[in-house]
Structure formats: structure tokens, C-alpha cells
Amino acid sequence: MDLRIDFRNPEQEIFFWSRKRNNRFGGGFGNGKTYVACQRAVVMLTTFSGYRMAFCRQVYKNLRATTMQTFFKICPKEFILTHDENFGLTVFINGSRIYWLHLDQMDEATAKGFEINSLVIDQAEEVEESIFLLMDARVGRWDKAIVPQPLLDQFPEWPRHKVYGQPLV
């Protein structure tokens, strides 16, 4: 199945292709921040089997009403095995997962249990810095995502680029 990726503005394209560990995309209402984050998430979740991602927002009803709605507009239904809105978990047919989290009641003990490959915090300005740092520390804790063989063939020194010595992901 082909996934069509469209960019509404140059900033979306820069964000989508960025290889930096932490990315921020700011701007006015309706400029496509959530949309491009969801596009990028679908690509990561479907490319790497077993990939784990957390989508967060301060309040769950806002996450469900906005971010989740945008994600499911973009992600083809054929990729989804199960989605439990009440539990906040989406499982893909390739074993990848999304944890849908509200951060207004997040505590350190709960956050320490997450092992994820990446994190999207929608409306990050609503989130306390201490919670952001706690969630950010969980990124990279899950090492069971499977790198597709064509990528390994193309980049045999994965995850390091032989010229730059930098991580490719």
C-alpha cells in the first residue's frame, strides 16, 4: 500500500525529513504541525516493525478530539490491527504500537515504565518542563524495532553513517 505524503509548506517538509533526535515545529493555528507529525509517525510505525511511539497531550479529551482524529485521517485502516481508545493503545499489523497519553496526571513511576522509540507532544506549551524531560528520557529505551533488510543493505554500517559517524535514525 502506498502512503501519499503531501506538504502544505516548506517548514513541514523540513520537519518531516529532519534526522535530529528532537524536533520542534511551531506556528499558527492550522499551519499543519499535527498533520506533519502524524505523517512522520505513520512512516516510522509502518517502516519499522515493532516500533513504539507515544503521542501525548496535556489533557486526554483534547488528544482524542484533535491529534488522534488527525492521525486516523492519515493512517490507512489496513495498517491497524486494534485500536482501544479507552485504554489509549493502537497496535499495527506489523507489531508497532502507539501509546496515547495524557500528561496532566503523569507521574515519574508511570513514565519510567515506558520504553519507546519516539515521542510526539502536541501543544507542548501546555506541558510542564519536568514532565517533558521525564518523557524525553524514555525515548530510545525500546530496542526491539526491526530495521527492514533493504535499509540494512543500503546502509550496511547501520546505525552509523560511515562518513559522518552519526546515527542514521
Regions found by a protein language model. Give the residues of each.
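Phosphate/NTP-binding elements of NTP-utilizing enzymes
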Residues: 1-169
